[in-house]
Amino acid sequence: MASATLPAWIKMPSFLKKILKLRGRRQEDESRSRMLSDSSTQSYQVNQLTSEETEAGSTIPSTPSKGQALPTEPKVRAREKSRHRRPKIIDQVRRVESLGEQASQRQKHMLETLINKIYTGPLGEELVQTLYLRIWAMEETPESLKILQMREDIRDQVLKMKTERWLRTLIRGEKTKLKDFQKRYEEVHPYLMKEKVEQIIMEEAWSLAAHIVQE
């Protein structure tokens, strides 16, 4: 058969152009069919391999079922950790206060007499003036600032109540002795180191009650 390529000066008949065009289309169709056939074969092989590996249980990771335990969340860990924290210092102070009231009749009478003088007599006025000056002279803290900004009558009442609290904390038990006071002071010492106002009030309370312990 003659070559399909002719010199440029020879004009190609129209019927030959149609034959060449049809042959080109046929070759393109055959090439496209082979490509589709090869692609289908490869896809089938991949699907078959995946199916075999799935049956063997070796490739697809399993997801946790409803009954299966999930990893502990960080928030849950933090919540569980907070349950085991050490008790706060203020809790230690409350524990000291809850150990019992004064049981010795003589000391109890002296204690109640002292507290009554604080609320009704000149001893109370002298006490609140001393506390006010000591709190005013100390390094400023939120608690000291709060007390200094109170109205005078309210401040005096608050200071007397705080003093009574410390008196009842320090002077109690079957018969309070100096060693008992020392033990109670050691228990609340960390709290007093953070609360300087309370430390000042406790010191003044002890100064007023020392004669009761020494009886």
Curated annotation (Swiss-Prot):
Q: Where is the signal peptide?
A: none
Q: Where is it located?
A: Host cytoplasm
Q: What GO biological process terms are annotated to this protein in UniProt?
A: symbiont-mediated suppression of host innate immune response; symbiont-mediated suppression of host JAK-STAT cascade via inhibition of STAT1 activity; symbiont-mediated suppression of host JAK-STAT cascade via inhibition of STAT2 activity; symbiont-mediated suppression of host type I interferon-mediated signaling pathway
Extract the InterPro entries matched here: Paramyxo_C
Basic and acidic residues bias (residue ranges): 25-35
Location of the region described as Involved in self-degradation and in host STAT1 degradation in the Swiss-Prot/TrEMBL record: 15-22
Main localisation = host cell
In this chain, the stretch annotated as Disordered covers 12-34
Functional description taken from the UniProt entry: The different products prevent the establishment of cellular antiviral state by blocking the interferon-alpha/beta (IFN-alpha/beta) and IFN-gamma signaling pathways. They inhibit IFN-alpha/beta induced tyrosine phosphorylation of STAT1 and STAT2. Blocking the IFN-alpha/beta pathway requires binding to STAT1 in the cytoplasm. They inhibit IFN-gamma induced serine phosphorylation of STAT1. Block the IFN-gamma pathway by binding to and stabilizing the parallel form of the STAT1 dimer, further inducing high-molecular-weight complex formation and inhibition of transcription by IFN-gamma.
**What does the entry note on its domains?**
The disordered region at the N-terminus is involved in C protein self-degradation in trans. This self-degradation of C protein may play a role in the regulation of viral RNA synthesis. The disordered region at the N-terminus is also involved in the host STAT1 degradation in order to counteract the host innate antiviral response.
Question: Anything else of interest in the record?
Answer: The C protein is found in virion at a ratio of approximately 40 molecules per virion, presumably associated with the nucleocapsid. The P/V/C gene has two overlapping open reading frames. One encodes the P/V/W proteins and the other the C/Y proteins.
Subunit architecture: The different isoforms interact (via C-terminus) with unphosphorylated and phosphorylated human STAT1 (via N-terminus), favoring the formation of parallel STAT1 homodimers. The different isoforms do not interact with host STAT2. C protein interacts with L protein; this interaction has an inhibitory effect on viral transcription and replication.
Name-wise, this protein is Protein C'
